[in-house]
Amino acid sequence: MPDTNKKSLGITRRNFLAGASAFGVVAGLGTLAACSPSSQSKGSEDSSASTSASGGDQRWVPESIDKVYDTDLLIVGCGGSGIACAVQSAQNGTDFIVIEKGTMVGGNANFVEGIFAIDSTPQKEAGIEIEPADVVMAELERGQYRPNGALWMDLCEKSAENIDWLLDMGCLFSGVIDDYHGGLFQTFHWWKDGKAGVGYVEPMKAKMDELGIEPHLETAAVSLIMDDGAVVGVYAEGPEGVIQYNAKAVVLATGGFGGSPELLEKQGWNTESLHIVGSSNAAGDAYKMCMEVGAKDSLPYASQSVLGFIEALPVVSMEDAANPINGYWGIASGGPVLWVNEYTDRFNSENLRDISMVMPFHAMKDNAENYCIFDQAIFDKYFGLSDADVEVFKKSLEENLGNSLYQADSIEELAEKFDLDAKTLAATVERYNKMCEKGEDTDYGKAAEFLEPIAQGPFYIAKIGYSFFFTTGGIWTNKRREVLDESKKTIPGLYAIGNDGSMLYRNVYTINMPGTAFGNQVNSGREAANNARAYIQG
């Protein structure tokens, strides 16, 4: 049996600590930051913290300051939600600055395919009618009634107006509205070319230019500045050196923690074989800063957009997502294969992907190791559908990156490849084959169409890792997008939006309600802009 106490990571950890010595600290640098000063925001050079931050209870204080900016609102992060917050803030006439950790705006939003809405103008034109209650109750049921239904109702009620607003901003849609590969309702509004980078980010960037919004790029927030329990700014590091942003309110929009192996591991995921599809800049910077000032931790309840990953196989491209070898419904996703864990137990139905694409990998989370087993007949019928597919698999088997894919002439030999118990694995396969022969899965109710016996060699075994697209949640917030402390009281002046502060889901990202994650990006960004404006105005 494999060592279940392994802690090594299968990828190189990104170094987010460059320049941290200027702060007299080493841990926690970063924040997927976001955009630019408005024409009213002021910048000055200074060698010490300004009086607006002095006397506070901030945990980290830089030894020296190279630049000071004063503004009413600071938006930290210029991805999907940060962009919406910035544009809405500009329309509100708010004096603000937006900073961005990366070299360009958009972040993970560039790869999003569509957005949720009900009762939108395009849906009305297409004759699509969906009741808000149907959406809300379906989501609450899938979340075991743990999410706050008022948050879902808020998203539903504002979604149509958000689509109208996006159209007014110049955003581009393909015109297709569907259920996104078998979701529950036709709520998915596809961006032009199926990419938010084309339909959302570029048009919104043009709108930002029109409004005079200039992001402070390559600027990473390090810590929050506190004064008498309220957030009054951020310390950051960027091209201008160590920067102090004084603000009356701060909105965090750093993209979640999907780019942080450490936080994924803390949440219980095995990160030994890990592929980060989304931006590595989404490294939990907002989460870390909020925890430092006493925010309530919702990391145990945060959700993920996660698929399977076999290291030996090529990384799937968005343009080839349906590839039968390594695509979204490929070998790692389940279907006709057999799943076993480190104890050689079959632990669930292998066609959970019929519920949602992410569900199989939540079923695997509690295991130390996960493997899929199949034979040549299964490969030929389901995976090797073309000469190109066969060649890709053959090459992957020969190169065997990560020692994750093997062929053998017997089940017992397969077990040896991963130091599994040969006797119990053979017994598991035998039991499974008997159910396949009867055409009924009496253990987990797997669909009969996928009950294929593993009987004809050669046999194959692959170790399944995880491919992370993004995470959503981690910071406890309320309907106004305000960050809450351990007593569920607001931390004045602090907001978290998008994937940082989402409270829509509990542990499982219910992708079968198509487009809700990005719907929340836009909705929470606009709401935070409006609520922060009201807070600033008193």
Predicted regions and their residues:
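Conserved N-terminal/central alpha/beta ligand/cofactor-binding core
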Residues: K6, G19, A53, W60-P62, ...
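Glycine-rich loop(s) and the adjacent beta-strand/alpha-helix scaffold that form part
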Residues: G238, Y245, A249-L313, N512-P514, ...
